[in-house]
Amino acid sequence: MADYPAVIEIPKGSRNKYEVDHETGRIRLDRLLFTSMSYPADYGYVEDSLGEDGDPLDALVLLDEPTFPGCQVLARPIGVFHMTDEAGGDDKLLCVPANDPRQAHVSELEHVNEFDRLEIQHFFETYKDLEPGKSVEGASWDGREDAERCVNEAIARASEAGLTTARWRLPNTSQH
Protein backbone atom coordinates (compact mmCIF):
# COMPACT_ATOMS: atom_id res chain seq x y z
CA MET A 1 0.00 0.00 0.00
CA ALA A 2 1.47 3.30 -1.07
CA ASP A 3 0.66 6.75 0.28
CA TYR A 4 0.35 9.86 -1.88
CA PRO A 5 0.27 13.60 -1.18
CA ALA A 6 -3.22 15.01 -1.70
CA VAL A 7 -4.06 18.71 -1.73
CA ILE A 8 -7.46 19.59 -0.31
CA GLU A 9 -9.43 22.16 -2.30
CA ILE A 10 -12.83 21.81 -0.63
CA PRO A 11 -13.42 20.96 3.03
CA LYS A 12 -16.13 18.53 4.08
CA GLY A 13 -19.48 20.27 4.54
CA SER A 14 -18.81 23.10 2.08
CA ARG A 15 -21.04 24.12 -0.83
CA ASN A 16 -18.28 26.37 -2.16
CA LYS A 17 -16.33 24.74 -4.99
CA TYR A 18 -12.79 26.01 -4.64
CA GLU A 19 -10.07 25.21 -7.15
CA VAL A 20 -6.32 25.65 -7.05
CA ASP A 21 -5.01 27.67 -9.99
CA HIS A 22 -2.11 25.41 -10.95
CA GLU A 23 -0.19 28.24 -12.62
CA THR A 24 -0.28 30.73 -9.74
CA GLY A 25 -0.91 28.45 -6.76
CA ARG A 26 -3.81 30.65 -5.67
CA ILE A 27 -7.10 29.22 -4.52
CA ARG A 28 -10.17 30.65 -6.22
CA LEU A 29 -13.89 30.21 -5.77
CA ASP A 30 -15.08 28.43 -8.90
CA ARG A 31 -18.76 28.42 -7.97
CA LEU A 32 -21.31 27.68 -5.29
CA LEU A 33 -22.97 24.32 -5.87
CA PHE A 34 -26.36 24.83 -7.50
CA THR A 35 -27.90 22.02 -5.46
CA SER A 36 -28.47 22.28 -1.72
CA MET A 37 -25.79 19.67 -1.08
CA SER A 38 -22.38 19.84 0.54
CA TYR A 39 -19.23 17.83 -0.02
CA PRO A 40 -19.36 14.58 2.00
CA ALA A 41 -15.58 14.48 2.61
CA ASP A 42 -12.55 16.69 2.15
CA TYR A 43 -12.03 16.88 -1.62
CA GLY A 44 -8.99 17.70 -3.71
CA TYR A 45 -6.45 15.97 -5.91
CA VAL A 46 -3.32 13.84 -5.89
CA GLU A 47 -0.25 15.98 -6.48
CA ASP A 48 1.66 15.58 -9.73
CA SER A 49 -1.05 13.47 -11.33
CA LEU A 50 -3.08 13.84 -14.49
CA GLY A 51 -6.53 12.25 -14.72
CA GLU A 52 -8.25 11.16 -17.91
CA ASP A 53 -10.16 14.47 -17.95
CA GLY A 54 -6.97 16.55 -18.20
CA ASP A 55 -7.09 17.66 -14.55
CA PRO A 56 -5.21 16.21 -11.59
CA LEU A 57 -6.73 12.97 -10.28
CA ASP A 58 -9.54 13.76 -7.82
CA ALA A 59 -9.31 12.47 -4.26
CA LEU A 60 -11.65 12.41 -1.28
CA VAL A 61 -10.01 12.06 2.12
CA LEU A 62 -12.06 10.74 5.04
CA LEU A 63 -11.05 12.86 8.03
CA ASP A 64 -12.65 13.31 11.44
CA GLU A 65 -12.49 17.11 11.05
CA PRO A 66 -12.52 19.20 7.86
CA THR A 67 -9.23 20.79 6.83
CA PHE A 68 -8.94 23.89 4.62
CA PRO A 69 -8.25 24.73 0.97
CA GLY A 70 -4.58 24.23 0.15
CA CYS A 71 -3.89 21.79 3.00
CA GLN A 72 -1.67 18.87 2.02
CA VAL A 73 -2.59 15.46 3.47
CA LEU A 74 -0.59 12.28 3.05
CA ALA A 75 -3.35 9.95 1.87
CA ARG A 76 -3.77 6.20 1.46
CA PRO A 77 -6.16 5.20 -1.36
CA ILE A 78 -8.61 2.46 -0.41
CA GLY A 79 -11.06 2.61 -3.32
CA VAL A 80 -12.13 4.50 -6.41
CA PHE A 81 -15.51 5.70 -7.63
CA HIS A 82 -15.64 5.58 -11.42
CA MET A 83 -17.94 8.17 -12.97
CA THR A 84 -18.31 10.19 -16.13
CA ASP A 85 -19.24 13.85 -16.44
CA GLU A 86 -19.64 16.22 -19.37
CA ALA A 87 -15.84 16.24 -19.84
CA GLY A 88 -15.42 12.44 -19.85
CA GLY A 89 -13.99 9.98 -17.34
CA ASP A 90 -13.73 11.54 -13.88
CA ASP A 91 -12.55 8.97 -11.32
CA LYS A 92 -12.63 9.87 -7.62
CA LEU A 93 -10.15 8.19 -5.28
CA LEU A 94 -11.39 7.44 -1.79
CA CYS A 95 -8.59 7.80 0.75
CA VAL A 96 -7.86 7.88 4.45
CA PRO A 97 -5.11 9.94 6.09
CA ALA A 98 -1.97 7.79 6.14
CA ASN A 99 -0.75 8.92 9.56
CA ASP A 100 -4.02 8.79 11.52
CA PRO A 101 -4.01 5.94 14.06
CA ARG A 102 -7.84 6.00 14.05
CA GLN A 103 -7.73 5.01 10.37
CA ALA A 104 -4.80 2.56 10.55
CA HIS A 105 -7.17 -0.41 10.23
CA VAL A 106 -8.80 1.01 7.08
CA SER A 107 -6.98 -0.54 4.14
CA GLU A 108 -9.82 -1.68 1.88
CA LEU A 109 -13.01 -0.11 0.54
CA GLU A 110 -15.07 -2.65 2.49
CA HIS A 111 -13.72 -1.16 5.74
CA VAL A 112 -15.74 2.01 5.05
CA ASN A 113 -19.35 1.91 6.19
CA GLU A 114 -21.66 1.03 3.29
CA PHE A 115 -23.93 3.99 4.06
CA ASP A 116 -20.95 6.38 3.85
CA ARG A 117 -20.09 4.95 0.42
CA LEU A 118 -23.72 5.35 -0.71
CA GLU A 119 -23.74 8.95 0.53
CA ILE A 120 -20.60 9.75 -1.48
CA GLN A 121 -22.02 8.01 -4.55
CA HIS A 122 -25.33 9.87 -4.24
CA PHE A 123 -23.51 13.19 -3.93
CA PHE A 124 -21.50 12.70 -7.10
CA GLU A 125 -24.46 11.35 -9.06
CA THR A 126 -26.65 14.38 -8.24
CA TYR A 127 -24.53 17.42 -7.28
CA LYS A 128 -24.60 18.91 -10.80
CA ASP A 129 -28.32 18.27 -11.43
CA LEU A 130 -29.33 21.95 -11.50
CA GLU A 131 -26.31 23.27 -13.44
CA PRO A 132 -26.93 24.10 -17.11
CA GLY A 133 -24.68 22.15 -19.47
CA LYS A 134 -23.37 19.84 -16.75
CA SER A 135 -24.09 16.16 -16.40
CA VAL A 136 -22.95 13.20 -14.37
CA GLU A 137 -23.36 9.51 -15.00
CA GLY A 138 -22.89 7.42 -11.90
CA ALA A 139 -20.90 4.31 -12.22
CA SER A 140 -19.34 1.94 -9.78
CA TRP A 141 -16.97 1.47 -6.88
CA ASP A 142 -13.77 -0.54 -7.14
CA GLY A 143 -11.34 -1.47 -4.40
CA ARG A 144 -7.82 -0.61 -3.32
CA GLU A 145 -5.98 -2.42 -6.12
CA ASP A 146 -7.90 -0.53 -8.81
CA ALA A 147 -7.44 2.73 -6.88
CA GLU A 148 -3.68 2.22 -6.75
CA ARG A 149 -3.65 1.39 -10.47
CA CYS A 150 -5.60 4.61 -11.22
CA VAL A 151 -3.26 6.80 -9.18
CA ASN A 152 -0.11 5.21 -10.61
CA GLU A 153 -1.42 5.67 -14.16
CA ALA A 154 -2.30 9.31 -13.39
CA ILE A 155 1.17 10.00 -11.97
CA ALA A 156 2.79 8.33 -15.01
CA ARG A 157 0.53 10.33 -17.35
CA ALA A 158 1.66 13.60 -15.70
CA SER A 159 5.30 12.57 -15.80
CA GLU A 160 5.11 11.60 -19.48
CA ALA A 161 3.51 14.97 -20.24
CA GLY A 162 6.23 16.75 -18.25
CA LEU A 163 3.64 18.28 -15.92
CA THR A 164 3.40 18.82 -12.22
CA THR A 165 0.21 19.98 -10.54
CA ALA A 166 1.72 23.47 -10.71
CA ARG A 167 1.74 22.95 -14.52
CA TRP A 168 5.43 23.85 -14.65
CA ARG A 169 7.51 21.75 -16.99
CA LEU A 170 9.70 19.23 -15.20
CA PRO A 171 13.43 19.66 -15.79
CA ASN A 172 14.78 17.51 -18.59
CA THR A 173 17.13 15.25 -16.64
CA SER A 174 18.12 13.13 -19.65
CA GLN A 175 20.62 15.80 -20.75
CA HIS A 176 22.40 16.09 -17.40
Summary of predicted features, one role per range:
Residues 1-176:
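Hydrophobic N-terminal alpha-helices or hydrophobic patches in metabolic proteins across all domains
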